[in-house]
Amino acid sequence: MGSNFHYTIDLNEDQNHQPFFASLGSSLHHHLQQQQQQQQHFHHQASSNPSSLMSPSLSYFPFLINSRQDQVYVGYNNNTFHDVLDTHISQPLETKNFVSDGGSSSSDQMVPKKETRLKLTIKKKDNHQDQTDLPQSPIKDMTGTNSLKWISSKVRLMKKKKAIITTSDSSKQHTNNDQSSNLSNSERQNGYNNDCVIRICSDCNTTKTPLWRSGPRGPKSLCNACGIRQRKARRAAMATATATAVSGVSPPVMKKKMQNKNKISNGVYKILSPLPLKVNTCKRMITLEETALAEDLETQSNSTMLSSSDNIYFDDLALLLSKSSAYQQVFPQDEKEAAILLMALSHGMVHG
């Protein structure tokens, strides 16, 4: 009878395919040693009888395990090695039978004495359990409850902020709309009231005009024509007022001007005018020149008269001295001539 062994292996690694060598403890090793002894016995039989077939050496079987699958069941006996997987596995794993020198093996031809079966059950924990053991990161792991709560709190805060901003903006818009509506309503009411007021010109009593002007009764109390007419009248009145003011100031000025003219005509203020000054200066220069000429003539006449008189006087003096006997006795002839010359020199009669 055959013996079955069941082993369970947990896989917690993320590798896709891993080579696994089935050395599963002391008990498994003990059974494998028994199987090796049986295989050696078959080898001796094959050497003695070459027609007999030899069993495969199945001490350690390398096989591949897909860690992505949930459970892997491995069926083991001394003839075949099959992998029984779940229904979602498309292609089952098959192991090769190792045959000795040139022999062919089949399950029908081999008849072992003892049949041993080894059943391996490989289980992999769920992602949820693995992720709960590991530290949770809110960005990479999106399946954890704590991370979901943390992210949801952030999202809630952001949503609250957005909601507050939107509510504030909406309230501001509502207030602006209310203010604009109130202003428009007030403007409409004021315009309606202004339109309803019937204006009458205080001058011509008209009610239709393109433009209302200010008048003596206040703003917009005159029509356009009356306002222009009254404005012209005001300007004319202002011009006449300025003219009368100028006329009230002008008579004394004119009187002063006439008096000045009269004074100039009378000769009192002739010196002030520039033309009489020039004439007077010319006249004075002429008179001065005339007086200078007259004086020169007088001096010349006087000098001639004096010279003639001196000459006459000198001649008379010479005659008198020549005739006097006393003068002749006192002064000799040389001295007489010298005295006459000195007298002549003193009177300027002799010119050298």
Curated annotation (Swiss-Prot):
It holds the Pfam family GATA. Residues 27-53, 163-189 are annotated as: Disordered. Residues 165-189 have a biased composition (Polar residues). Its main location: nucleus. SUPFAM superfamilies: Glucocorticoid receptor-like (DNA-binding domain). It is found in: Nucleus. Keywords: Cytokinin signaling pathway, DNA-binding, Gibberellin signaling pathway, Metal-binding, Nucleus, Transcription, Transcription regulation, Zinc, Zinc-finger. One of its GO terms (biological process) is negative regulation of seed germination. A zinc finger (GATA-type) spans 195-249. InterPro entries: GATA_ZnFinger_Domain, Znf_GATA, Znf_NHR/GATA. A motif (Nuclear localization signal) lies at residues 112-119. Expressed predominantly in leaves, and barely in stems, flowers and siliques. SMART domains: ZnF_GATA (SM00401). One of its GO terms (cellular component) is nucleus. One of its GO terms (molecular function) is transcription cis-regulatory region binding. Disruption phenotype: Pale green leaves and reduced chlorophyll levels associated with altered regulation of sugar-sensing genes (e.g. HXK1, HXK2, STP13 and PLT6). Reduced chloroplast size. Faster seed germination. Early flowering. Increased leaves size. Reduced gibberellic acid (GA) levels due to increased GA turnover and associated with reduced expression of GA-anabolizing enzymes (e.g. GA3OX1) but increased expression of GA-catabolizing enzymes (e.g. GA2OX2). Small seeds with deformed seed coats. The double mutant gnc cga1, lacking both GATA22 and GATA21, exhibits reduced sensitivity to cytokinin (e.g. Belongs to the type IV zinc-finger family. Class B subfamily. PANTHER family: GATA TRANSCRIPTION FACTOR 22-RELATED, GATA ZINC FINGER DOMAIN-CONTAINING PROTEIN 12. Transcriptional regulator that specifically binds 5'-GATA-3' or 5'-GAT-3' motifs within gene promoters. Involved in the modulation of chloroplast development, growth and division in a cytokinin-dependent manner. Repressor of the gibberellic acid (GA) signaling pathway that regulates flowering and modulates greening, in a SOC1-dependent manner. Prevents the accumulation of SOC1 during flowering. Promotes chlorophyll biosynthesis throughout the plant, by regulating chlorophyll biosynthetic genes (e.g. HEMA1 and GUN4) and chloroplast localized glutamate synthase (e.g. GLU1). This is Putative GATA transcription factor 22. It comes from Arabidopsis thaliana.
